[in-house]
């Protein structure tokens, strides 16, 4: 199983603001692009992939939207507007939820009111965590564990205080090269590296 977490610090937790954020300061289109590149390949979708989007621009609780490739049925296509609409439906389903609650949105998609920190604590129990960092070990040289989870951010960097928490969870830093890439580009390179290794 390959898992990805995108910490979308600028992404709002209401569907209206999310949709308005496409192409604007929040850059919510990154969610659609990352979903497309984690889940889909030409004429098919990948098996055994999970992506978690943690949307943090909120007045109450962060929203963690989880999409499981093995369980999604008909998401309606894989162009940007369709994919961002799936995220918006999850946000609509989360209205009125209390802290640390979960709701199923549709097959393969759930929404939870949990923070990034809480999510990665849970994932660390049965995944090896990898954080992308230009100063990390080059991915071609890195040993990737059997149940990897890759941590990414939107255009707002990971807060420095998060690094110590992630380190305590055994997170390893890996690098995809000298250039700072979009999260949606990173997932393509990670998938390709693991595909080449016949993971």
UniProtKB/Swiss-Prot annotation:
Cellular compartments annotated: Cytoplasm
Binding site for S-adenosyl-L-methionine: 132, 186
Record EC number: 2.1.1.-
Any one Gene Ontology cellular component term annotated for this protein: cytoplasm
Keywords (A to Z) from UniProt: Cytoplasm, Methyltransferase, S-adenosyl-L-methionine, Transferase
Top-level class of the enzyme under EC nomenclature: transferase
This protein's record includes keyword Signal: no
GO biological process, one term: tRNA methylation
Record GO terms (molecular function): S-adenosylmethionine-dependent methyltransferase activity; tRNA methyltransferase activity
UniProt-listed Pfam families: Methyltrn_RNA_2 (PF04013)
Disulfide bridge positions per record: none
CDD domains in the cross-refs: TrmY-like
Family note: Belongs to the methyltransferase superfamily. TrmY family.
Cited PANTHER family: TRNA (PSEUDOURIDINE(54)-N(1))-METHYLTRANSFERASE
NCBIfam families: PRK02135.1
Annotated protein name in UniProt: Putative pseudouridine methyltransferase
Source organism (scientific name): Vibrio campbellii (strain ATCC BAA-1116)
